[in-house]
């Protein structure tokens, strides 16, 4: 163990707990109590919700870095390298730094069977602590109430939105899911919610915990016309905001959330109009409507539920509407295949389904049968991801548009493959 590399550590962590997901805070709190983890008192952001967490986090990250702060971020899952999960000023930490944190967790863990995610979460907190990050941006993994990230005391809790996803863990209705997501609301700590449709369980939890609750559309908003938008927060406003042309409502909501969170924790950190427009002009998040221009135009998006597919559709519609799309799709077994596909189908000329390199992936046979049974005839299959990518490359023309979507587990390999081409 002393001489293990990162890959060996990660493989071993997968064997510690027989369950891949084992929602409970008892184990991680027990181990955390033996470590010195001290998040910044005024700049610790805990970001939950169904969709938009990564984009909201990235916007806050860019704004705080622009203001000269040392910003630590913890996100999951990763696209290709585990190190992507733990970044300081957007730069992934190196293997040796991660391994030192793993060793420290293991030295105090004793016989407590931490899950892979719990072990990594503790290592992330140790790393951000040891590197003296002035702000912590923490993305919730699954749900909220029992998620490993929920052991920290945030300065603000952010819930982006509530949609159907992970129903086997979080509940089958929006209110049940909202109750789990609301678990990140801390007593007397402000919370912001990024959807005008406020679930009763979020409102009730905030009330019970004495937390000030700020709701998009009620307490803060972005309004006006394109190129001259105005963000209005609690007491502050930013005028003449230029939103990127390919953004849809989801990204606009994420920006509203990011700005509101910053105003609440420290309004002095809000950007000027010039600073914000410069930031937005250069803003991107890997795997979120990421456009890679080769011979063809490749669009990579990690959307994996119907709510995310709706936003993806709006972004696709912002492009040339006369160009039909070839879509490469794979989804995990717990995802709603038809709910996802029917949102995008009329934009797609040809579907190619394939299986990801994980036992949680839907089989290619299941994906193809579901699409055909739904009435989609323009669907073919590939035996694996690389076959799907290369077949599409070889059978499409210059400037054709190719969408790869459905999971981090297909977008990551696609990005790696495209980088090597």
Question: What are these language model-derived features?
Answer:
Residues 1-51, 55-70, 79-80, 96, ...:
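N-terminal leader/targeting and accessory segments in enzymes
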Residues 5, 19, 25, 29-40, ...:
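ATP-dependent carboxylate-amine ligase catalytic core
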Residues 43, 130-131, 135-140, 147-158, ...:
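Nucleotide phosphate-binding/pyrophosphate-handling subdomain across enzymes
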Residues 60, 145-155, 415-418:
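Short Gly/Thr/Asp-enriched flexible loops that form oxyanion-binding sites at enzyme active sites
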Residues 77, 192-195, 207-224, 245-249, ...:
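Beta-strand->loop->alpha-helix junctions that form or flank phosphate-binding loops
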Residues 144-146, 153-211, 337:
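Conserved catalytic-core segment of NTP-binding enzymes
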Residues 192, 196-201, 208-213, 225, ...:
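C-terminal helical cap/extension that packs against the catalytic core
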Residues 407:
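Active-site-proximal loop/hinge segments that shape catalytic or ion-binding/gating pockets
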């Amino acid at each position: 163990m002393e001489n293990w590399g990162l890959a060996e550590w990660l493989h071993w962590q997968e064997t510690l707990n027989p369950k891949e997901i084992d929602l409970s805070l008892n184990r991680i709190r027990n181990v955390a109590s033996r470590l010195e983890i001290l998040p910044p008192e005024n700049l610790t952001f805990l970001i939950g919700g169904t969709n938009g967490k990564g984009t909201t986090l990235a916007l806050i990250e860019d704004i705080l870095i622009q203001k000269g702060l040392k910003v630590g971020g913890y996100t999951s899952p990763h696209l290709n390298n585990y190190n992507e999960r733990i970044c300081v000023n957007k730069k992934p930490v190196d293997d040796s730094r991660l391994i030192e944190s793993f060793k420290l967790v293991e030295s105090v863990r004793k016989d407590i069977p931490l899950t892979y995610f719990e072990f990594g979460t503790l290592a992330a907190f140790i790393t951000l602590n040891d590197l003296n990050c002035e702000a912590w941006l923490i993305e919730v993994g699954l749900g909220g109430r029992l998620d490993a990230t929920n052991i920290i005391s945030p300065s603000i809790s952010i819930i982006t939105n509530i949609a159907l996803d992970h129903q086997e863990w979080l509940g089958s209705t929006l209110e049940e899911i909202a109750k789990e997501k609301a678990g990140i609301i801390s007593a007397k700590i402000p919370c912001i919610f990024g959807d005008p449709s406020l679930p009763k369980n979020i409102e009730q939890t905030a009330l019970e915990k004495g937390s000030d609750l700020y709701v998009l559309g009620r307490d803060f908003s972005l309004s006006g016309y394109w190129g001259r938008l105005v963000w209005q927060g609690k007491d502050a406003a930013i005028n003449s905001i230029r939103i990127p042309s390919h953004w849809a409502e989801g990204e606009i909501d994420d920006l509203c959330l990011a700005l509101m969170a910053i105003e609440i924790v420290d309004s002095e950190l809000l950007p000027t109009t010039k600073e914000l427009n410069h930031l937005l002009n250069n803003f991107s998040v890997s795997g979120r409507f990421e456009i890679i221009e080769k011979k063809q135009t490749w669009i990579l998006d990690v959307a994996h539920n119907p709510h995310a597919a709706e936003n993806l559709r709006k972004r696709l519609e912002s492009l040339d509407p006369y160009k039909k799309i070839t879509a490469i799709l794979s989804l995990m077994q717990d995802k709603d295949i038809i709910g996802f596909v029917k949102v995008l189908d009329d934009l797609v000329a040809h579907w190619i389904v394939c299986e990801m390199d994980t036992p949680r992936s839907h089989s290619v046979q299941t994906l193809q049968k579901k699409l055909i049974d739904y009435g989609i005839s323009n669907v073919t299959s590939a035996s694996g991801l690389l076959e799907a990518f290369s077949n599409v490359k070889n059978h499409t023309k210059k400037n054709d548009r190719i969408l790869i979507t459905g999971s981090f587990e297909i977008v990551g390999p696609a990005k790696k493959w495209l980088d090597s081409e």
